[in-house]
Amino acid sequence: METLTIAYATDENYAKLVWCSLKSLLENNANFFTVKAYIISDNLSNSSKDKLSNLISSYNGKICFIEFDSIAYGLDNACTFQNGKTSYARLFLAQIVKENKILYLDCDTLINHSLCDLWNTDLEGYYIAGVKDIIAPQLKQDIQLLPTDIYINAGILLINIQEWKKNKIESQFIAYIKKMNGKISCHDQGIINHVCKNKIKTISCTYNVMTPFFYLSSLQIKEIFELKDYYNDIEIKEAISHPHILHFTAGWHIRVWYSNSKHPYAYLFKKYYNLSPWKKTPLPLGHLTLKIKVLRNIFKILPFSIYLKILRIKRERAKCCLLYTSDAA
């Protein structure tokens, strides 16, 4: 039996989400000898640290807290951290992880089955493994990737720490950030996909079941995001029916940590939340932006072909605006 080594990154705002994710992982992974968790934090309170420590110790696991600023000194002032400091934490894991590999998890995840098969993925010759993401083609172009290049979602990553150390991947991350003056599409995710190009292994989409899977078919995903290759409908349907890792990404559903979420797995989050030390604090109401509501309603009302035309016109206008702004500058 092995030790499952994992990492989360959080600040005080997301501590309760980390607790729920970690609880779900511990509940579904008794087949591991133990679980060791690295928590990279940005001013996480002692109270929240105690809650997480008590949780993992109740399963005979181990936990280690690392302050983000203590490992990210190489960035200097190269980043503005628009998504918050801790979203960049995964870039620095090789500094702190003693093991040869680690599973990084975003805090907006729930683990629903054993991760044994994922953990045993062969990473020889690869820096990283993950699930192919759903992104606009312009975002790949922005980080100097071709449309055919693999681009994964960085919310769930199986990382070959041994290779990161050997090839000084952290230094490459920092060099790319500075080269781009900190302005990189999708921030840390864009950095990872650029630097790890040609060394990325794709895995089953059951290990990162994202929100769009619940309302878009494989063909619609490929058409909307101009993807040549993606998971097929059988793979996606199997993933949403029997997810190993749920990832509550942005989309047409209000996020599950809001009381009015209609995400198909909102009930599962509430189950773990009601077991947490925060259970007496009611979940707040959430809201979708007007832009998302409009796009969702257009998709529901109009034929898909018309929706696609509207979307492409919108993208072309955005490109023109960008070009005009660049020329004016």
Give residue ranges: language-model regions:
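A glycosyltransferase accessory/donor-loop signature
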Residues: 1-4, 10, 17, 166-323
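Acidic donor-binding segment of Leloir-type glycosyltransferases
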Residues: 36, 41-65
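Conserved donor-nucleotide/metal-binding helix-loop-beta segment in metal-dependent transferases, i.e.
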Residues: 113-140
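Active-site-proximal specificity loops/subdomain of glycosyltransferases
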Residues: 59-92
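The conserved acidic donor/metal-binding loop of glycosyltransferases
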Residues: 106-110
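Short aromatic/hydrophobic "clamp" motif used to bind/position activated sugar donors
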Residues: 102
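Short, acidic, metal-binding catalytic loop of nucleotide-sugar glycosyltransferases
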Residues: 24-32
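Conserved small/polar residues in nucleotide/adenosyl-binding loops
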Residues: 324-329
